[in-house]
Regions:
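C-terminal substrate-binding/active-site "lid" region of AdoMet-derived donor-dependent transferases
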Residues: 253-307
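SAM/dcSAM-binding transferase cores
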Residues: 10-27, 43, 300-392
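S-adenosyl-L-methionine
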Residues: 3-182, 194-232, 362, 377, 381, ...
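Nucleotide donor/acceptor-binding cores
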Residues: 160-161, 189, 265
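Short SAM/SAH-binding signature in class I
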Residues: 231-240
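Conserved SAM-binding motif I beta-strand of class I
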Residues: 187-195
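A short, conserved alpha-helix within the catalytic core of class I
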Residues: 244-255
Length: 392
C-alpha cells in the first residue's frame, strides 16, 4: 500500500463511518481508533466497553479499518504503523486510564465479604434456563447481579423496602436472597417478579425455596396491564427491557403501574449500547413517562454468551415525579423486540473459512443465533464476525 498523506488518512474516518452507516460519524471512528491505541492489543469487546458503541458496530468498523491497512489482522488487535501515524495526526496518542482502579469506573465495588455470593450465584446460573435471544435476552454475570443488589442498597431501597422486578431472566430476585443470606440480614420486605417465562419463574421458585426466600411470582405477558394485585404496591422497581424504544416504554410503564404513589420512587433501568439516534428515542420515552435521571453508570451491566448485547450495558437510576404515569394503560399491540423492528440485513463472516452470509429479515437466517446454531454451511464451523449492513 502506498504511503498516504495525513489529510487522506483523516478522510478515511468519514469513509469508514459511511461504509458501516455509523450514526456517530467520524467521531465514532475516531473513538474506536483511540481505544485501540490505548488498549492494544485489544479484543472487540474491550473496545466496545471503552467507547460505549454496540459490539457489532465496533466489529464492523474494525473490519473496515483492517481493509484500509489501519488495523492489524491478528486478534486481539492493534493499530498498524499507518494506524499509529493516523492516531498521532489525530492527537489521540495519550495512554492514560482515568477509571477508578478499584471499581473500574462502575462506581460500585463488590466487597470481599460478598465473594461467596458471587460464587453461589454462578452455580445457580449454571442450573438455570438459557437466554432466549428472540426476547432480547442476554444473561448478566453473577458480579452484575450482586452489583444490582448493591445499587438498590445504595439507593436506600434495601434493606427494608419492597422491589418489583419487571422481567427477571437475570435472577436479581435470587441475588437479593443470596446477598442477604451471606450478610445475615433479610434485605427486602417484599420481592415481586413478573415474567412471561415459566422456565424462569420455576427456576426462581426452586431456588427461593432452598434459600427460604419469599418471592411473589406472577406469570404474565407484559403486553397486558399489570395485574391489579401488584399495582401500587412497591417502593422501587427494576427492569432490563427489550432493547428498543417500544420495549422501554412498555416495561417502564408496567414498573410505574407497580409503584406506590408519590414522587422520588426509585427505578433502576438497564439497557444496552445503541446508536445515538436510537438512544435519543429511548431517553425521550423516559421523559414522556414523567421520570427524571438521578444517575447513570456506563458498562455497569456485563452480559454472558452471545445474545443481543454479548457485552455491556448501562444502569440508569430514575426517579418518579408528580407527573409520572404509565404510557400504556391498556393492551400493547405494536412491535417490541429488536427482531420485530430490524429491517436491514447484516453480513456475517465465518472465522474458520471467511465465507460471508447475510443475516436478518428475509435472509436464510433471521438472527446470528440461528446461523450459529446451524453452523457455517460452507465449512460447518464458526464463530461468526459481524460486518457491514447490506445495502438496501
Amino acid at each position: 500500500m502506498n504511503a498516504a498523506s495525513p489529510n487522506s488518512d483523516i478522510a478515511l474516518l468519514a469513509e469508514v463511518a459511511e461504509a458501516v452507516r455509523l450514526q456517530e460519524g467520524e467521531m465514532g471512528v475516531r473513538a474506536i481508533l483511540q481505544a485501540f491505541r490505548q488498549l492494544a492489543p485489544a479484543p472487540t469487546r474491550a473496545i466496545s466497553r471503552r467507547t460505549g458503541l454496540p459490539l457489532p458496530i465496533v466489529a464492523a468498523v474494525g473490519n473496515e479499518l483492517r481493509s484500509r491497512g489501519l488495523l492489524g489482522q491478528e486478534r486481539p488487535s492493534r493499530l498498524t504503523e499507518r494506524g499509529l501515524a493516523l492516531a498521532a495526526e489525530l492527537g489521540v496518542e495519550l495512554n492514560l486510564d482515568p477509571d477508578c482502579y478499584r471499581c473500574g469506573g462502575l462506581e460500585i465495588a463488590i466487597p470481599s465479604v460478598l465473594n461467596e455470593a458471587v460464587e453461589r450465584l454462578r452455580r445457580i446460573m449454571a442450573d438455570g434456563p438459557n437466554a432466549d435471544v428472540s426476547l432480547d435476552q442476554s444473561l448478566c454475570t453473577a458480579e452484575t447481579k450482586v452489583r444490582r443488589v448493591l445499587a438498590l442498597i445504595r439507593a436506600g431501597v434495601l434493606p427494608g423496602g419492597s422491589v418489583l422486578l419487571v422481567g427477571d431472566d437475570d435472577l436479581v430476585s435470587v441475588a437479593i436472597g443470596v446477598v442477604g443470606d451471606v450478610l445475615g440480614v433479610p434485605l427486602a420486605s417484599r420481592v415481586g417478579v413478573v415474567d412471561i417465562s415459566t422456565d424462569i419463574l420455576d427456576h426462581i421458585a426452586d431456588t427461593a425455596s432452598a434459600l427460604d426466600l419469599r418471592v411473589d411470582l406472577e406469570q404474565h405477558d407484559l403486553r397486558e396491564p399489570l395485574p391489579q394485585r401488584l399495582r401500587g404496591q412497591f417502593d422501587a422497581g427494576m427492569t432490563d427491557p427489550p432493547y428498543t424504544a417500544e420495549g422501554t416504554r412498555l416495561f417502564l410503564s408496567r414498573v410505574v403501574e407497580g409503584l406506590k404513589p408519590g414522587a422520588a420512587r426509585n427505578i433502576l433501568f438497564s439497557f444496552g449500547a445503541k446508536g445515538t439516534e436510537e438512544m435519543l428515542e429511548v431517553q425521550q420515552e423516559i421523559l414522556g413517562l414523567g421520570l427524571v435521571t438521578h444517575g447513570m453508570i456506563r458498562n455497569f451491566n456485563s452480559y454472558e454468551g452471545s445474545g443481543i448485547l454479548a457485552g455491556t450495558g448501562f444502569l440508569q437510576h430514575l426517579l418518579t415525579t408528580a407527573s409520572t404515569a404509565s404510557l400504556v394503560e391498556g393492551t400493547y399491540e405494536g412491535p417490541l423486540y429488536t427482531r420485530e423492528k430490524r429491517s436491514r440485513q447484516r453480513e456475517y463472516e465465518c472465522v474458520s473459512c471467511s465465507a460471508r452470509f447475510p443475516v436478518g429479515a428475509g435472509a436464510r437466517w433471521n438472527s446470528v443465533a440461528d446461523l450459529r446454531d446451524a453452523g457455517c454451511p460452507q465449512c460447518g464451523g464458526g464463530p461468526f464476525r459481524p460486518l457491514q449492513l447490506v445495502a438496501e
